[in-house]
């Protein structure tokens, strides 16, 4: 039977000094021998998805104490991708994921914590904490801050639901007045919480449900609803139970690596494809699997994408549907329930809250349960009042959305499409693969052939788009924006949004070794691997080259002969793999260190050891 890790610093005469310090934090004689639970918070006033988390760590801590544990809270950093977007701040977003993972490891191992509750929410925070959980392999429960409510705007006689991306698109569209743009801006993000669509933050919080590491509703119930408080209270109680099961009953089945097995990662990716999640989730699942020492690769993702249907379309794929609508339809447990009925899941895998995923679905899938409390939970609705306060309203929808033919969540028979919302493409421009969010691509351009317009940075591409230099039929190629080349693998939300603003959302493609925001849609192909800085063929594309994209057949092809491609490679290798034009970009020492040690997107942009 394993000893409590905390015993290292709480027992023995040689630890008198450490115990003295523990006492100075409030511990008493009776606390030594109890499990020490790290409450890993990520409160910050910089990020709307985290601004309401300040007191929630202590809410969880109180439940831990009441359940017989000792709670000790610390904070991680949290970068807001939306605020960091469109300037050099975005260089820091992806590297912050690894910094968060390291900081959690440092704090938990330095202080010998026995277990942890991870309070996350936005884009890189959940992945960073997930990587740390897999690395540490101690009992853990994830609980996120929750989605913000969708914005509402009365525009030219109609009321519509909007989000951050809508504000960005109209801001670059000259047909809107300054007053109209300001109204979108004021209305887009009305409450605390992660941005309201199926963007990266919400995608990752949904995936923790599928991985079995968080409670039902974690990914979907809005941050403002009183029922979300129940998740935090339950997390505090549950983590003490899990810690005692492992350390006092020798039950290793509740450890993260026992729960997040390859089968669980495949379940999570199956969910991701079915709900049209952010392409960033591919990076993060690959990275988490790497930490868990699970053999989960791009090939697994490719195989799943060919047979998993799209069962839900949420903004940005369907602009009038947001996470609050997914919750009303039964949340993630409902999507998993439909996938189970289509025989696309392994429901024998365990979770932190039920013995198996099957047991969880029997209890929480609104189609199969008869529990009125579950029905009420999923009727939790937005409050419609701007606020930065968690759990501040208690409104309910009058009915659930159980329509599986035309509703927000469909069954497999009535799927939006028969193959997945994410796809892996291969070809001579992406030998190790690239990713496209097919759920956000119009059917008319699933096959697309166009002429390359090559840019050595996101900034240059944005300037060309806003300057009306991009025309229908162009393939915008943005390179040297990968994990090494950026460095930091910037998101390309501005270029995709501006293409929409110019009316080119269905007439152009964008191909990059960078990545896309979860808010991006359109024919946006990212994570091209190998990246240009690694000698990838994207670094050999020239203006005017023809690029053929065939999503149904999962191919992307630079239409030049092998001899020409080989000649270009010889010339480029002599010059070195770097942008042809000098970029106005300040790369700090921290970013240079990141660039030296990161791998390609095809491997999750994890570090080389």
Curated annotation (Swiss-Prot):
Cofactor needs: [2Fe-2S] cluster; Mg(2+)
For this protein, the Enzyme Commission number is 4.2.1.9
Q: Which residues cross the membrane?
A: none
- Which keywords belong to this entry? 2Fe-2S, Amino-acid biosynthesis, Branched-chain amino acid biosynthesis, Iron, Iron-sulfur, Lyase, Magnesium, Metal-binding
Name this protein carries in UniProt: Dihydroxy-acid dehydratase
Positions of [2Fe-2S] cluster binding: 122, 195
Record text on subunit structure and interactions:
Homodimer.
The record ties this protein, via InterPro entries, to: Dihydro-acid_dehy_C, DihydroxyA_deHydtase, DiOHA_6PGluconate_deHydtase_CS, ILV_EDD_C, ILV_EDD_N, IlvD/EDD_N
Q: In which pathway does it act?
A: Amino-acid biosynthesis; L-isoleucine biosynthesis; L-isoleucine from 2-oxobutanoate: step 3/4; Amino-acid biosynthesis; L-valine biosynthesis; L-valine from pyruvate: step 3/4
Transmembrane: is it a keyword of this entry? no
The family assignment reads: Belongs to the IlvD/Edd family.
Query: Which sequence positions carry the modification called N6-carboxylysine?
Result: 124
Per the Swiss-Prot or TrEMBL record, the active site comprises 517
Q: What does this protein do?
A: Functions in the biosynthesis of branched-chain amino acids. Catalyzes the dehydration of (2R,3R)-2,3-dihydroxy-3-methylpentanoate (2,3-dihydroxy-3-methylvalerate) into 2-oxo-3-methylpentanoate (2-oxo-3-methylvalerate) and of (2R)-2,3-dihydroxy-3-methylbutanoate (2,3-dihydroxyisovalerate) into 2-oxo-3-methylbutanoate (2-oxoisovalerate), the penultimate precursor to L-isoleucine and L-valine, respectively.
Species: Acinetobacter baumannii (strain ATCC 17978 / DSM 105126 / CIP 53.77 / LMG 1025 / NCDC KC755 / 5377)
Q: Which Pfam families does the entry mention? A: ILV_EDD_C, ILVD_EDD_N
Q: Which PANTHER family match?
A: D-XYLONATE DEHYDRATASE (PTHR43661), D-XYLONATE DEHYDRATASE YAGF-RELATED (PTHR43661:SF3)
């Amino acid at each position: 039977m394993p000893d409590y890790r905390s015993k290292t610093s709480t027992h023995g005469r040689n630890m008198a000094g450490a115990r003295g310090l523990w006492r100075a934090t409030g511990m008493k004689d009776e606390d030594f021998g109890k499990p020490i639970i790290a409450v890993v918070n990520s409160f910050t006033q910089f990020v709307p998805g985290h601004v309401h988390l300040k007191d929630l760590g202590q809410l969880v801590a109180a439940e831990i104490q009441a359940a017989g544990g000792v709670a000790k809270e610390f904070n991680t950093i949290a970068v807001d991708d939306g605020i960091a977007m469109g300037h050099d701040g975005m260089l820091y977003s992806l590297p912050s994921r690894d910094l968060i993972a390291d900081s959690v490891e440092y704090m938990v191992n330095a202080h010998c914590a026995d277990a942890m509750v991870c309070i996350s929410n936005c884009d890189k925070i959940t992945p960073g904490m997930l990587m740390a959980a897999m690395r540490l392999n101690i009992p853990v429960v994830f609980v996120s801050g929750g989605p913000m409510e969708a914005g509402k705007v009365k525009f030219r006689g109609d009321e519509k639901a909007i989000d951050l991306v809508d504000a960005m698109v109209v801001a670059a569209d000259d047909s809107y007045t300054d007053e109209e743009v300001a109204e979108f801006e004021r209305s887009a993000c009305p409450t605390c919480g992660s941005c309201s669509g199926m963007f990266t933050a919400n995608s990752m919080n949904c995936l923790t449900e599928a991985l079995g590491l968080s409670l039902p509703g974690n990914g979907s119930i809005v941050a403002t609803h009183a029922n979300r408080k129940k998740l935090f209270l339950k997390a505090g109680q549950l983590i003490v139970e899990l810690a005692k099961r492992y350390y006092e009953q020798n039950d290793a089945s509740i450890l993260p690596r026992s729960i997040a097995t390859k089968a669980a990662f495949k379940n999570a990716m199956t969910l991701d494809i079915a709900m049209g999640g952010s392409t960033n989730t591919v990076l993060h699942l690959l990275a988490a699997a790497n930490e868990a020492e699970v053999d989960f690769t791009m090939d697994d993702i490719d195989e799943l994408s060919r047979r998993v249907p799209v069962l839900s379309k949420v903004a940005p794929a369907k602009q009038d549907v947001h996470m609050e609508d997914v919750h009303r339809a039964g949340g993630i447990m409902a999507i998993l329930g439909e996938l189970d009925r289509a025989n696309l899941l392994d429901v024998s895998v365990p979770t932190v809250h039920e013995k198996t995923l099957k047991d969880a679905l029997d209890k929480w899938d609104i189609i199969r349960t008869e529990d009125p409390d579950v029905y009420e939970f999923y009727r939790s609705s937005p409050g419609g009042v701007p606020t930065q306060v968690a759990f501040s309203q208690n409104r309910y929808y009058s009915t659930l959305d159980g329509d599986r033919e035309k509703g927000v969540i469909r069954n497999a028979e009535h799927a939006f499409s028969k193959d997945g919302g994410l796809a892996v493409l291969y070809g001579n421009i992406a030998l190790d693969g690239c990713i496209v969010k097919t759920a956000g691509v119009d059917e008319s351009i699933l096959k697309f052939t166009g002429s390359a317009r090559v840019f050595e940075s996101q900034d240059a591409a944005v300037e060309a788009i806003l300057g009306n230099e991009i025309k229908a039929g162009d393939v915008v190629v943005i390179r040297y924006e990968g994990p090494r080349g950026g460095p930091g693998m910037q998101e390309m939300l501005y270029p995709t949004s501006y293409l929409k603003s110019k009316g080119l959302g269905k007439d152009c493609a964008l191909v990059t070794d960078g990545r896309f925001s979860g808010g991006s849609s359109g024919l946006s192909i990212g994570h091209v691997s190998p990246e240009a800085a690694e000698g990838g063929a994207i670094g050999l594309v020239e203006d005017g080259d023809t690029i053929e994209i065939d999503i149904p057949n999962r191919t992307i092809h630079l239409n030049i002969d092998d001899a020409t491609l080989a000649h270009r490679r010889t010339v480029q290798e002599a010059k070195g793999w770097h942008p042809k034009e000098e970029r106005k970009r300040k790369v700090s020492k921290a970013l240079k260190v990141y660039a030296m040690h990161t791998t390609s997107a095809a491997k999750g942009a994890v570090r080389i050891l």
